[in-house]
């Protein structure tokens, strides 16, 4: 956990990171197996949550980056679980805030029910790569033109502009 106990990163039995992106995915999979419903994560999170949610017959909803945005969307759609790809789990059954201790309890419950090592649990989920880089922009760069170029280039793919371009 981090110092204010709102994010959770896990390590498997072989010393490999479970991946903080997949903390929310695994915990959500467990919650959805017990309480069917919808999920929310911010746009800087893996697509794997969408896949797991749809597999469990729920609807995934993206939200702008920031806990306040995720919580607002969760309340709007009455999500059963949500969070951020940084290991922040929000479980409204208890409260609307990121909580690593809740994440630990839910993850360990999932692992106990799964009955196999954490590495095998992680292998159950689709593997996506997400690059989180900060790009320094100067005033003369035309962001709108760049975004339009990217939208055209990737027109065959779903495009989300809630918070930037994904």
Q: What are the language-model segments listed below?
A:
Residues 35-166:
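Phosphate-binding and adjacent anionic-ligand microenvironments
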